[in-house]
């Protein structure tokens, strides 16, 4: 398994992962019918950097890193992670989150924040907690889950400096 920086050409292999996860509507606050062009902007063009996880020529996962706020908040980054349904349970999200923290430090970020974690995404919440993230806020009924209705969204944060 290899994590490397993505190029725009990688988007053809990222798109099926993005489409599957976003269309499910269970974890990301993107429109379930997000177009390929919109997804390219969200995942490749806007972020500071995007990465892919590859194995035997297959793209198994991806993440982006970007500045969360401008000005006085520009020392805090935000990341988004996606793992192909065929590769879940293999530690890719852990590997990507650990990799992203190293990248964040190299880019000069002091902290990482996840802005809108669906509280029903138990696996992600457990993983982020195990990697040192704390829930610093709860947005009541802010996420409209397709089968569970309005559920809480969490703001999770980790100071990266030791």
Each model region followed by its residue ranges:
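Acetyl-CoA-dependent GNAT
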Residues: 27, 31-86, 97-98, 103, ...
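Short hydrophobic/aromatic beta-strand or adjacent loop that forms the aromatic wall/cage
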Residues: 48, 151-155
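Helix-loop element at the rim of GNAT/NAT acetyltransferase active sites that forms part
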Residues: 15-33
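Glycine-rich acetyl-CoA-binding "A-motif" of GNAT/NAT acetyltransferases
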Residues: 58-61, 123, 150
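Conserved catalytic-core motifs of GNAT/GCN5-like acyltransferases
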Residues: 113-117, 129-151
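Conserved acetyl-CoA-binding loop-helix of GNAT-fold acetyltransferases
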Residues: 89-104, 125-130
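Conserved GNAT acetyl-CoA-binding A-motif
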Residues: 104-116
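A short beta-loop-alpha structural element at the N-terminal edge
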Residues: 2-14
């Amino acid at each position: 398994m290899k994590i490397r920086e993505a190029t725009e050409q990688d988007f053809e292999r990222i798109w099926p992962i993005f489409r599957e996860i976003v269309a499910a509507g269970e974890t990301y606050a993107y429109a379930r019918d997000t177009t390929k062009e919109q997804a390219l902007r969200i995942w490749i063009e806007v972020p500071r950097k995007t990465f892919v996880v590859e194995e035997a020529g297959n793209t198994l996962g991806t993440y982006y890193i970007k500045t969360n706020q401008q000005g006085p908040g520009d020392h805090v980054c935000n990341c988004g992670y996606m793992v192909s349904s065929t590769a879940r349970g293999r530690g890719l999200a852990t590997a990507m989150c650990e990799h992203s923290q190293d990248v964040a430090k190299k880019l000069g970020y002091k902290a990482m924040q996840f802005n809108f974690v669906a509280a029903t995404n138990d696996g992600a919440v457990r993983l982020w907690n195990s990697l040192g993230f704390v829930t610093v806020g709860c947005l009541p009924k802010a996420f409209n889950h397709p089968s569970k209705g309005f559920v809480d969204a969490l703001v999770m944060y980790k100071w990266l400096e030791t």
